[in-house]
Structures are given as C-alpha cells and as structure tokens.
Swiss-Prot record:
Family assignment from sequence similarity: Belongs to the inositol polyphosphate 5-phosphatase family.
Source species of the chain: Arabidopsis thaliana (Mouse-ear cress)
BP term (GO), one: leaf vascular tissue pattern formation
Hydrolase recorded as keyword: yes
An example molecular function term from Gene Ontology annotations: phosphatidylinositol-3,4,5-trisphosphate 5-phosphatase activity
Catalyzed reaction equations: a 1,2-diacyl-sn-glycero-3-phospho-(1D-myo-inositol-4,5-bisphosphate) + H2O = a 1,2-diacyl-sn-glycero-3-phospho-(1D-myo-inositol 4-phosphate) + phosphate; a 1,2-diacyl-sn-glycero-3-phospho-(1D-myo-inositol-3,4,5-trisphosphate) + H2O = a 1,2-diacyl-sn-glycero-3-phospho-(1D-myo-inositol-3,4-bisphosphate) + phosphate
Biased composition, class Low complexity, residue ranges: 242-253, 291-311
Comp. bias (Basic and acidic residues): 254-290
Residue ranges of the region described as Disordered: 30-62, 241-330
Keywords noted in UniProt: Abscisic acid signaling pathway, Differentiation, Hydrolase
Protein name as annotated: Type IV inositol polyphosphate 5-phosphatase 6
Region ranges (Catalytic 1): 458-473
Top EC class for this record: hydrolase
Length: 617
C-alpha cells in the first residue's frame, strides 16, 4: 500500500515538474482567494471562472444559427427600446504597487504601514512583487516555494485590516533620509544650485478630511518623505483648479499658500451628460464626484490647490509638465493645517485573488462590501525566463469584472541586463505576454463582458520590474542623479525611448516621474550599489526599473510615488488611480402612464460618487 502511494506521489510530482518546465497550462489557472462565506478569514484555492457550455451533440446548420442570432438581436433591440438601462458610473480608488524584494522573505515584524497606509483607504489594492524567492535553480526548476508568499499575505492582511500603529509594531518608522527631495526641473541644471540648500516642505495631503474626526486618540500616520508626482492632480475626484494670480517660489512656501477657499469650489459643470473622462481633459473644469463614498467621509471642500507657477515642458513625451517644486502634496500626511484628522476606514478587506509563478507574485484585495460585485476572476501566466518559457521571468495577469466594467492587472518581471540590445529582449517579452495571455471565455449574461486577452479589457494596469535601464554610463547617470536632473535622465530612459519610437507600449500611459531611480541600492542603505565598488568592477547604472503603466479610458492617476524602504535593493513604487466603473440596472416599463414614467429628482442630480446615463443599446 505504501509503495503504491509512493509511486503515485512520484508520478504526480513528475507531472507537475514537466508542466512547469514546458510551461504546459492546465485547463484552468488556479489561484488563491478568501472564502466569501468566512468574511475574509479563511483562504481557499479556486480555479479561473469558466462557464463554457458543453458543446451540443447536435450540430446546427449555418442557416439555423444565423436565423437564431438574428431573432436574438431583434428581440434584444426591442427590449432595449422598451426597457432602457440605467447606467450608473461610479468612481473607485485603486492602490497599485510594485516591489522587487530581491529574494528576501519578510520578517514577521516588517512594517508595511508607511506603504499601504500612505493615503486614504482605497477600494481596491493591487500589490505585485518580483523575486519573492531567490531565483536559483532549485526554485526555478523544482517545486514552488510558497512560504514567502504566505508571509506576505499575512502581513498585508494584518496591515490593511488594522489602523496605523496597531498592526503589532511600534508605529511608523522614520523614513530613510533623502537629500534634497525636490528639484526645479525648468531651471538650468548646469548653473542652478537653488535647490541644494532648500528644506523639505510639508506637502499637503490629497485625502479628504472632516471636522468630525478630531479625536486625538485615533492613531495617525506620520508625515512621510516621498518623491511624488500627480499626472493630473485630483482632489475628491475633481481636477484641482489653481489660482492664476498666485505666484510661488521654490524656496519658501506657507501652508496657506496651497489652501483653497470653500467658495472656490462652488462652481459645478453645467453639463452633467459628459463622462468624467471628458472633464479630466480640462484642468479648469470641476468634476461632480467625491474621492470616497459618503459613508466613508463627509463632504467638505478641498483645501488643496495647485499653484499656477508651473511650466509646461516642451517635451511632453518625457512627462515633465509640472515642476515638483510647485506640485506639492503628500499622500502620507495625517492632517492639514486646520487640524482635521484623517480617519482610517474600519471596514475589512478580503483577498479576491493571489497567484505566484516562481518569484512573480500578484495579489488583489477589495473592501468586503465590494466582494459580491467582483465576478469572473480569471488568471493567466506567461513564462519568459530560461529557454524562453520558464517562470523566473514573465507575467501573471488577473482578469476580473467589477459591476459591468472589466479590469486586467498585469504583474511582470522582464529580462534583465544593461548591455546594448537588452532593451529589445524586453520589448519582445512585452509582445509575447500580450500575445500569449489568454483568459477562458465566460458565457453567462449577455450583458456581462468576458475579455479573452489583455487589451480587450476596459481598464488595464501593467506593473512590475520592467528592467528598462538608462542608456548612459554609470558616471554620467550618477552625476545627473546628484543634480536631480530627471529630465535629462528620462531622455535616456530606454522605456521612454522605445515607447516614443512605437516599439513597445504604444498607446499606453505612464505618470510623470519626479523621483530618483529605484535601482540598484546597496543593502540596507540609501547609496547606489556602484558607490561601494571599485571603479574597475562592473557597476549597475541607476535606473527606473520599477514602473506602472495603464491602458484604456476611465482611469485617472492621482499620484505616482516611490517609497523609501531599505528592505531590498529596489525601492517600491506605487500609484493611486481613480477608476470609472459602470453598473447597469434595467427599469421595466409596464405602462406608459405618468406614474410609471416618472423619474425621481435624485436620479437627475450627479451622484456624490459618480453619474448616471440612459442607454438604449
């Protein structure tokens, strides 16, 4: 009996290794998620949702199929005219982060508060990791080590479901010291030294405070130092209007200089029939929606404004429009100058999906009240490592449907190397990931979307260690880093160069970068690793390896930030997005009487969190 069991185990192990080595996919990709019935406490292993109907044993003729399709379309058109759908468009906040942890397993007391609690609680957390295990032969060719992944899940769960300072640690740690956090990008870097003696300014928070949260007993996050940028600064989901008469200097700012009067936000757009994406194109417009739900925060006019003392770069491809010396805010601020406290939502978060492929690890968390609206979870993995298909490099893609809007989150670790031509290998990785990522089609309601590849989704966010380097020598790049000349560095950034040439990520967006390169640092240090090496030894040129990009309408980036943890030789990078999500409701008209066709007044007003449309198709 024991011999038979042993043979069975060996056979199962052999099959698993063959599948791993040759990247043979099972019919459904398994992933880990919380059991919905256990309120996010227990974890279960699930398979990608696939509701393909069994093929019929009787094959219909082509004429019968066409006739049936025509009848269904005619019936659907008639129903759409008789019963128009009410489409609610709501705004949800998404926290997206990527971190290469250099093969280090997290200690149980690792503090993630400064990372995950650096902003107002988001509706969705998308956290991607690379190298959660060492990329040695044992982990690449052998059985998968999921021990570190479980540790990360435990730490994330504890951090998200606890207020800052109560996650079992001594609260917020002092962030790593950063010399001269901001630079005047529009100055002449060869002769400008104004920023060298400037002090760090307490940047304003984009969180929405309320006067009801003045309780000093509520633990609050400490002010953090981060290099940050907002592609289009939104506060409470409205573009922040700026005062044209305001003129500020980069050397001294008062908190009051960045505050707005409540009357400045009394304006509302007169045409609410436009989508929020229409308003986002115009900085002067206001958008009638709040950053968070009414249940989470009380409405209050924003105190944040963007000063008008900024200049547009002539080279928009480098993403250097607004100078960081004038766009000042901090997602880590705990209160504004009026003393308003920032509450931390006590609602629980649950794990909806997590997947590991060797060192790549992607995990998605949502607020518990959203869990029932998340459907059609599907996972697809593409290996691009050894021999072109092993999982030490590659991607994990997770597809999901939130209400009626499809999302795809792609976590990648691309080919490394800083030799000339290595960027072409990374381009090839991206193309192969887009080509080979496939999701099983779901056949359920006709109204539910079931994308089968990445670009078919409504909203796509791509994160990870993309490994694109800066095409300069170590000495030249280091000199520009010390000058904080991000523009010159970005002009030599391989990703920007390849994207501008149309070789990769054509049509994709990335936020403006105003933080130093995130790779490669000496262990537990703020020094780049090349500083500790002999000049004749091989040095890693500082580079922005860790990136977040997005594709599709209805996504607005609120911030693009780097963290300062010394845990790895990479610095974590995260962005906060506002995502438009559609939810459709069918209103059945039984009669044409006045009472049946009456529209409530509330439906004509803009929602505090979105807006409403009528759709006949």
């Amino acid at each position: 009996m024991r011999e038979e069991k042993s043979k069975t185990n060996k056979l199962a192990w052999s099959k698993k290794m063959v599948r791993k080595w040759f990247n043979i996919k099972s019919k459904t990709e398994e992933f880990q998620a919380d059991d919905p019935s256990s309120a996010g406490i227990e974890v279960e292993h699930r398979s990608s949702f696939s509701a393909e109907k069994a093929p019929s044993t009787i094959k219909n003729t082509k004429t019968e199929k066409l006739s049936k399709n025509w009848e269904q379309q005619a019936r659907q058109r008639r129903m759409n005219y008789e019963n128009p759908r009410i489409i609610d468009v709501q705004n949800y906040s998404i926290f997206v982060a990527t971190w290469n942890v250099a093969g280090r397993s997290p200690p149980s007391d690792l503090n993630l508060d400064e990372w995950l609690h650096s902003s107002a609680p988001a509706d969705i957390y998308v956290l991607g990791f690379q190298e959660i295990v060492p990329l040695n032969a044992g982990n690449v060719l052998g059985a998968e080590d999921n021990g570190p992944a479980q540790k990360w899940l435990s730490l994330i769960r504890k951090t998200l479901n606890n207020r800052p300072g109560t996650s079992g640690t001594s609260g917020y740690h002092t962030p790593s010291p950063i010399p001269v956090p901001m630079a005047e990008l529009d100055a002449d870097f060869s002769g400008s030294t104004r920023q060298k003696n400037s002090t760090f300014f307490h940047r304003r928070s984009f969180q929405t405070p309320s006067s009801t949260w003045n309780d000093p007993s509520i633990p609050q996050p400490g002010l953090d130092r981060r290099f940050s940028v907002c592609d289009r600064v939104f506060f409470s989901h409205r573009p922040s209007d700026f005062d044209p008469s305001f003129r500020g200097s980069s050397s001294s700012h008062r908190p009051s200089d960045y505050s707005r009067r409540p009357s400045d936000y009394s304006r509302r757009p007169s045409d609410y029939s436009r989508r929020p994406s229409d308003y986002s194109r115009r900085p002067s417009d206001s958008r009638p929606s709040d950053y968070s739900r009414p249940s989470d925060y009380y409405s209050r006019p924003s105190d944040y404004s963007r000063p008008s003392d900024f200049s547009r770069s002539s080279d928009d491809d480098n993403g250097l429009g607004d100078s960081p010396s004038t766009v000042l805010y901090s997602p880590g601020s705990a209160a504004n100058e009026n003393g308003y406290r920032i509450p931390w939502n006590s609602s629980q978060y649950c794990l909806v999906a997590s997947k590991q492929m060797v060192g790549v690890f992607l995990t998605i968390w949502v607020k518990s009240e959203l869990r029932e609206h998340v459907k059609n979870m599907k996972v697809s993995c593409v290996g691009r490592g050894l021999m072109g298909y092993l999982g030490n490099k590659g991607s994990i893609s997770i597809s999901m449907l939130l209400h009626q809007t499809s999302f795809c989150f792609v976590c990648t670790h691309l080919t490394s190397g800083q030799k000339e031509g290595d960027e072409l290998k990374r381009n090839s990785d991206v193309m192969e990931i887009l080509k080979k990522t496939r999701f099983p089609r779901v056949k359920s309601s006709e109204e539910e979307k079931s994308p089968e590849n990445i670009l078919q989704h409504d909203r796509v966010i791509w994160l990870g260690d993309l490994n694109y380097r800066i095409a300069l020598s170590y000495r030249s790049a280091k000199a520009l880093v010390e000058m904080q000349n991000w523009r010159a560095l970005l002009e030599n950034d391989q990703l920007r160069i390849e994207q501008k040439r149309g070789h990769v990520f054509k049509g994709w967006n990335e936020g403006k970068i105003y933080f130093p390169p995130t790779y490669k640092y000496s262990r537990n240090s703020d020094r780049y690793s090349g500083d500790d090496l002999h000049p004749k030894e091989k040095r890693r040129t500082p580079a922005w390896c860790d990136r977040i990009l997005w594709f599709g309408e209805g996504l607005h980036q609120l911030s693009y930030v780097r963290g300062e943890s010394r845990f790895s030789d990479h610095r974590p990078v995260y962005g906060i997005f506002c995502a438009e999500v559609e939810s459709a409701h069918n209103r059945i008209k039984r009669t044409t009487s006045y009472s049946a066709s009456r529209v409530q007044a509330e439906e004509l007003l803009p929602y505090s969190r979105g807006y409403t449309e009528l759709s006949f198709f």
